């Protein structure tokens, strides 16, 4: 990406970050654009295999599946993210997202939660 586009993207991102958004999903989408991380694409590549089917006890993702997540969320979002980062039960550390950092994992968890409303 050339410097002009980078500068423009950074300026738009800075302005948009101070604007009022209709919901948190828009903020998440902006963050994905600004750092090149796309939670939906990464979910499909790294999380879908287990979380779409509930394999090995993974909480399912999809409309109306929040009840699968609620027992895990009783400990708080940070605990859910920590479990995803460190691994829990049959899930290995970072699931199958070996190139994800902790912020990426948090974005993936938030994406799965939003998708499960």
Language-model segments: residues:
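Processing junctions and N-termini across compartments
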Residues: 16, 22, 41-44, 85, ...
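Local sequence-structure signature of Cys/Sec-based thiol-disulfide redox active-site neighborhoods
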Residues: 37-49
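Gly/Gly-Pro-rich "capping" loops immediately C-terminal to redox-active cysteine motifs
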Residues: 51-80
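N-terminal export/targeting leaders of redox proteins
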Residues: 1-37, 116-117
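The canonical Cys-X-X-Cys-His
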Residues: 47-53, 108
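Axial heme c-ligation environment in periplasmic c-type cytochrome domains
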Residues: 58, 83-106, 112-115
């Amino acid at each position: 990406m050339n410097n002009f586009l980078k500068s423009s993207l950074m300026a738009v991102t800075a302005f948009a970050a101070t604007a009022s958004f209709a919901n948190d999903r828009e903020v998440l989408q902006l963050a994905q654009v600004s750092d090149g991380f796309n939670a939906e694409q990464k979910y499909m590549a790294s999380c879908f295999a287990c979380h779409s089917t509930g394999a090995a006890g993974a909480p399912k993702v999809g409309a109306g599946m929040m009840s699968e997540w609620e027992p895990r969320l009783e400990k708080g979002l940070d605990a859910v993210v920590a479990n995803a980062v460190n691994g829990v039960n049959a899930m290995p550390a970072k699931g199958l997202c070996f190139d994800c950092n902790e912020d990426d994992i948090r974005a993936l968890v938030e994406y799965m939660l939003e998708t499960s409303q």
